[in-house]
Amino acid sequence: MLNIETSAEEQLVLRKYNYPTEHADSLRAEMAVRQLINTLHSDGYLLASTVSRTKVNNELRLRVSIGEKFAWLKLSSGNVENSLLRRSGYKQTQFEEKPFRFNQVARMEKSLLSFAERNGYPFASLKLDSLRIEENQIGASLNLDLGPLILFDSLDIKSDFTLKARFLGNYLGIVQGSPYDQRKIDYLGQRLRNLPYLRVSEASTLTFQNSEATVHLKVQKRPVNQIDGIIGFLPNSNKSDGLLITGQVDIDLLNPFGSGKKIGLHWQKLSEETQNLNLLYAHPNVLGSPLNFDFAFDFLKQDTLFTKRIFDLKISYNLGGNSFLNAFSSSEGTNLIGTPKITNNELPSVVDFDLTSYGLGFDWNNFNDPFLISKGTGFNLKASTGNKKISRNVGLPSAVYQGVDLKTLQYTFDLNFQNYLRLKNNFVLVNKLRGGLKANDQLFRNDAFRLGGLKTIRGFNENFFFATKYALATLEGRLLFDESSYLLLFSDLAYLRGEFKTSPTSDWALGLGAGLSFATSSGIFNFIYALGSSQNTGKFNFNQSKIHFGYTTRF
């Protein structure tokens, strides 16, 4: 039992503070009293102290003297420049004949020193100078000692593979000759974890010598260059018996020249007549700047209906840590392969068109690993607008284009959210939410988002669904054997709507299944069994189940 005694006048002050009176032992009671005294000091009662203590049976009695509350006489700016004071939140009126609050001074000190640390002065210090006390008022002036200007030296890198110091310095923002910035040091670990082709073998260290700061890194090569092959065995809907074999090849080369670049080639054979090719080139820190350049080309042949080609150019800027602001442009063109039959002088479900769009995006994540994610959250947003031009096809009657606006504005929005929650050492709960929207009065099937298959709605053929707006939620549980081997159970639930000019559609789709992923000495093997059901395709049918094999080699 804790009993705090004060004078009758000070008891009025003490009533404003809540403190527990019941404690398991005297040590915890003493800690509660110290916390109370510290709070009184922070609120301006600088002379508050414990005068005496007596312990009687289970009761601890303390006599506390609170004293007078101090106020500012005046806190002058001293030698601190006005621009720095404004950044710290300092206002003269807050420190002139106002109650003295220690936390207010501490916040200002932290803000000033943080600004100094970010601008080349890691050894800056702040103190109160010309201190004077008149009765219960305090007067002082600020005295900021910046210390020596510190510049970054070149990175000291010890690695067992080719990694150019100039590239890594630009990527980390630690450029030789630039002012020291504590934020770059704070973000160092996370930024290095985002590089999939290396592993930090020892904690980084920082040394200061001759007004220069040197960051020492020791990293090892991580085998992440990939050659992935997936074979799928699906029932062939065009034949009463037999299987349709689909395939996919993914080649990703990361850091091929020691400067962080990425080269990718991805090919898919989705059905007998459908194939897709994607090429990617990523160039980080162009000309030593914080800008990253990505170029992508995608080509799709959809059955005997149409071909589609997309050129994408993206420039991203690192906002700090793992936040990126993106600006991108896209040039999209699609052409009919054959001429569909026209029976009612209306446009077919696919048309020839060109679309040039521009947009902005934002990416952020705090994943614990770029590939083998077991903890963290990430999301990205994209929005774009562009001019769409429908081209007249000479194989179609001119009447089908009457009343059709051939030049329109088209809007596209994308959202992708992922969360990996590690509930126990060997169990991870994965939540994902994806969504997309295309807005235009002139939308056709070759405008649509394509969903279905191993990377979107499992239990369905690859790119089975066409949608101009969709929402996809994934819930997945993983039982880990190690960081790269696990059993999984999953569900994919999607709402899909196609607001096409010719024939609007809507559907709900659900995919359920289980799988296994395990690592070998040369790669990772994946096996997934999935069932799919939707309003338009009917209930779950084991005869239409999907089996996916995958093997990823890394070198």
What does each model-found stretch correspond to?
Residues M1-A8, K16-S237, T246-D250, G264-E273, ...:
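Periplasmic polypeptide-binding modules associated with outer-membrane biogenesis and secretion
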Residues R132, N318, S517-A519:
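Well-ordered beta-strand positions
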